[in-house]
Amino acid sequence: MTEKLIDFGLEQEEEDTEFVPGDSTDTESSFSDADSSEEEFVEEKEASQVQSTKSKIATSESEDVTLKNIAKKNKRERNDKLIPQQSNESEAIEKPVQSTTEVELKTNELAESNSSVAVEGDENSYAETPKKKHSLIRKRRKSPLDSSSAQKVLKKNKLNTLEQAQQNWSKYIKEQDIQDELRIANKDGYVERQEFLAKTRAAHEEKIREMKKLP
């Protein structure tokens, strides 16, 4: 067994010695060749993309040009169409032109008439309104006494509630003609008693004055 293990170890050493790495320059050249091939591939791809975009732009421009030419041709054909004079289309074309000219004439006439009326009105206003002369006489100022006297007159004309009630009551008595009935009913009333006492006092005072005047 020991001899077999020794033989197996020797075989592994021989295999290890047989593998010899190559030079480093060979590996570096292989890497540089791979990088250059990748760069060439990228450049070719970019060039193809640029050419495709240019072709697309050229096709779009050609389409625009063709569309514009078609549109111009259609316009020319429409403008160059001949129409007979007695057809409905010619009448429809001529009518709006006439109507617009008539409207413009009417508007011009109205504007001229309005301007003439305004000028005449201004002339009449200048003629009717004479210039105001400045008067040398000054107006008197209102005195405070006049205002106070006017206020007093207004206060006198105003009636109290009692005075207004008496006037209304007297008017009602005259309208209904109840004077006799009221006198009979109010013989023994408070108001008549007060009036009787006032009359007696006035008569007594007059007698006293006459007695004083005597020698």
From Swiss-Prot:
Residues 49-60 have a biased composition (Polar residues). Keywords: Activator, Chromatin regulator, Nucleus, Transcription, Transcription regulation. Its main location: nucleus. This is SWR1-complex protein 5. Residues 131-142 have a biased composition (Basic residues). Residues 139-215 form the BCNT-C domain. The lineage of its organism: Eukaryota, Fungi, Dikarya, Ascomycota, Taphrinomycotina. PROSITE patterns: BCNT_C. One of its GO terms (cellular component) is Swr1 complex. Component of the SWR1 complex which mediates the ATP-dependent exchange of histone H2A for the H2A variant HZT1 leading to transcriptional regulation of selected genes by chromatin remodeling. Involved in chromosome stability. Belongs to the SWC5 family. Coiled coil: none annotated. It is found in: Nucleus. Component of the SWR1 chromatin remodeling complex. Residues 1-153 are annotated as: Disordered. The keyword Transcription regulation applies. Transmembrane segments: none annotated. One of its GO terms (biological process) is chromatin remodeling. Residues 23-34 have a biased composition (Low complexity). The keyword Electron transport does not apply. It comes from Schizosaccharomyces pombe (strain 972 / ATCC 24843).
